Amino acid sequence: MKIKNILPIAIMVLLPFGGGWMGMTSCVSDDTTLPTRPLSEINIDGGIEALYNINKNETLRIKPALSQTNQPKTVTYTWEVDQQVYSHEEEFTYPAKELGTFQCRLIVENEDGKTFFPFTVNVNSPYEEGIALLSQQPDGTSMLSFMLTPSNGGPRSFTTGDCFSVNNPDLTFSPRCIDMVQSSGSLILACQGALPSASGAAQPVASSPSSGNGAAPTIYYLNEKTLVAENVVPVTEYDDFVPTRLVIPSVGASGVAYPILCENGSVYEFSTTEGAISKPTNFRYKYAQTCLAHDDGGAGWSFDLVFWDKEKGDLCDLYSGYGPYYCSTKYLLVRDSVNAQTNYFANNDIVKIVGIDLTAKQKRTDKSEMLILTKNAFLTRKTILSTGFWEYDASAGAAKLWDNGGTSTACIGTNIINEQTPCVANKTYYSLLFGDKNQVRRWNYATSQSLDKADVLQTFGSDRAIVTDLVLSADHLTTYVAFYEPDQTGLNGSVYVISTDTGEILERYDNVCYRPVKMIYKKK
């Protein structure tokens, strides 16, 4: 006699049992004749975890190991991501294209029942925090590299290939990248575009997927977590727009236009919220190729943008959108009032403007300062100024120029620093580190040490190597040094990490880029 048996639903928590996994088994309709046929239950024995952490652009692959309690039967697979069917393949292949947390489930079934395995995939940013680096090939082709600082303190390595092209496959990276800042959730990049030919037309660079043939000067907004371009601003309306410095604070404000310094000393203004380039309203003259953008990381309205006015021969500061005001013992001196008597730096030329970096602890108690190097004939002078020039003097009941006691001699004779020299200064060791050919030298700016007698802190590469950029760690204990070998082809750029105090080489990352042009430490 034929008897129809309905097997009960068995619900079990997913726990390891006897070397395998027990799951949830659905009810089965059994139309066989007596005696009852034994079921072949599915066990997930391994090859799959409850939690995965991967980085964007990585591919997760999962191939579970299965067993069946009785005679093996044909099984089918269903992979779900956020309650949507993703695949029916035996192996789960998941290219991580978006950041976030994704709830997933594996369903394996045969004719006797089903087994479920839920799991979570966290897709993290491979660009969360670390070194971002722009470099150029000899033909001008741009490249963006990144080295992640792992949260667990594990080993570090640079990405392979151009991060811009990887994350923006439909865009060409404009040639001759030159500067980069992190501001209000974005990495803002500046590229000078293709070199002009003798006829004035854009001169193409060698063809490659990222060469940007014939590209105009371009400003890019990249999402700081994904490096995906959120705004691309090609600039074709101004013939002399060849950017060299993005003078933009770390926090932008709506409605504020920030300066972009160009190769010929002119300045254009750029709205970070509107992505528009315009003629300047604040900096309308010619300026030296050394400047400073300083802010406290707070509100976007609190910043100092410091330039050297070449015609007036004086520093000027756009303070939180006001000014620019010129450096003088006279408070809030405007340009029309600058003369030999009011100009603090009268009869001097600029050598270098360097912000003096502070640790988080120092920022709570110390003034924000900058080191100013100027020259007059064979005499180089140093001045330590407040980034805002003036500080309130309670005893006088008024604002006074804060110049740390005034100007003093840095060196007599040949000056070994110029506007283009890579420099970093810190308050921890009261030292200025600067690149000099294939060396990093250290000058104790708070002492009477002559600048031309600065110590050699470390030497890099061959005798022909050139140091192009320096970046301090947040605690000042280490310094990142970017350099390249001009006689080498291909990836001829390297980054080393040294002790800021002793110069000892702590980490080496050889041949990770082309000629480095800009390096920053990208914060979370």
Kindly give the residue locations of the regions a language model identified.
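Acidic, serine/threonine- and glycine-rich low-complexity intrinsically disordered segments
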Residues: S197, V205-D436
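Beta-propeller domains
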Residues: Q136-F173, C191-A229
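Acidic/polar, low-complexity intrinsically disordered N-terminal segments immediately downstream
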Residues: K4, V28-N167, A190, A474-H476, ...
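C-terminal motif of bacterial Sec signal peptides marking the signal peptidase cleavage site
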Residues: G23-S26
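Bacterial N-terminal signal peptides that target proteins for export
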Residues: K2-V13
